[in-house]
Amino acid sequence: MADLENTLYMELKDGRVVIELLPDLAPRHVERVKTLARQGFYDGTVFHRVIEGFMAQGGDPTGTGTGGSDLGTLPAEFTRQRGFVRGTVGAARTGDPNSANSQFYIMFAPAPHLDGQYTIWGQVTEGMDHIDAIKRGAGGSGMVSNPDKIVSMKVAADAG
């Protein structure tokens, strides 16, 4: 049985994505994501940057890649215990390793060049086909016009 307190249900237009949270690797990031999910912060936010064969990035309330929550930045929680593979959920940040806030990305494919350089806080366990269906961006930036949205994101323990 899954640990419902450390499981997220992300509803997309095509269906549910289940994400196992990894508090053993990134306790502060997991706590932040759960807090924001419980506030409804992610509901209606978009996947603003989506690069084919790499990742889908979301969690920015402005939809531009420059926004975040009002909870401030988080210190990096890097690990070498686990690498970036298909379905890994990582914390997006600026060039400053201690600048993560609310944005995250989900990997379409392995990306070993990210290992130990970005915080891993989750792993998709169901619904990766729905992640694969997210609208892709154009050009090298991956910025998406008319992007797909997160319908809702909830902690499984709260989803009746």
Walk through the language-model features, giving the residues of each.
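Cyclophilin-like peptidyl-prolyl cis-trans isomerases
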Residues: M1-G160
